[in-house]
Amino acid sequence: MGQKVHPRGFRLGLSADWQAKWFNEKNYKEWLLEDEEIRKIIKNKYYHAGISEIYVERPDAERINITVKTARPGIIIGRKGSEITSLREELERKFNRRVVINIEEIKTPELDAQLVAESIASRIEKRASYKVAMKRAIMNAMRKGAQGIKVMVAGRLGGAEIARREWYLRGRLPLQKIKAIIDYGTATAWTKYGTIGIKVWIYKGDADI
C-alpha cells in the first residue's frame, strides 16, 4: 500500500517554509507547547479573519515574534490598532515575554488552500450542498490562476448512513515533483450527523531551484 507524504513537509526549505523559526534544546518542549497555544488563542479569537498561517520566531528567550497571514487584516488590527494591541498585551501577560505581532495580508484567498478548506467547511456547516461548495471553490481558484486544484471531503456526506469520501480534480497536481509549489490545507465541518473532513491541494506552478 502506498504511503502518503505531507505536501508541505516534502517541500520544506524549497517552496515551503517552517512555521516555527527557532531551536532550543533545553526549552524545546515548553516552547513547542507555547507555540501551539499561541496559534490556538489567535485562531479562536479571530476565526472569521481568514487566518491561513501563523509563524513564530524566537530571537532569544525573552522575545516572541509572531507573523499572522490573514485575508482580513482589519479585523485583527482593529480601529487605530486597538485589537492588535489588546492581543499583544494578552500574550505578554500569559507567556511573560515581549511579543511583537506582524500582519501579512493574503491578496488572493481563493489560492490559499487553508482558507479554501475553511470556506468549504463553513458552507457545509450552513447546510449548503457539499458538491456545490467544492465546485465553487475549484471554479474560483482556477479563475484566479491556479494551475491545478484537488478538493476531497470525507464523512457522512449529505447525512448518509455510511461514511464515504468524494473528490474533484481540475488541472494538474504533480505531487511527486519536489519543485512544484503545492499549497495544502485541511478543515473540519461539524454537522448534526458528525464531522466531515476537508482537504485541499492547490498547484501554483514550479519554484526556481
Swiss-Prot record:
Keywords, in A-Z order: Ribonucleoprotein, Ribosomal protein, RNA-binding, rRNA-binding
UniProt xrefs under CDD domains = KH-II_30S_S3
Q: Give a GO molecular function annotation for the protein.
A: mRNA binding
The KH type-2 domain sits at 38-107
One Gene Ontology cellular component annotation held by this UniProt entry? cytosolic small ribosomal subunit
Coiled-coil annotation reads none
Q: Name one Pfam family in it.
A: Ribosomal_S3_C
Asked if the record carries the keyword Ribosomal protein, the reply is yes
Free-text function comment from the UniProt entry: Binds the lower part of the 30S subunit head. Binds mRNA in the 70S ribosome, positioning it for translation.
* Quaternary structure and interacting proteins, as annotated: Part of the 30S ribosomal subunit. Forms a tight complex with proteins S10 and S14.
Give the family per the record. Answer: Belongs to the universal ribosomal protein uS3 family.
Its recorded name reads: Small ribosomal subunit protein uS3
**What species does this protein belong to?**
Thermotoga maritima (strain ATCC 43589 / DSM 3109 / JCM 10099 / NBRC 100826 / MSB8)
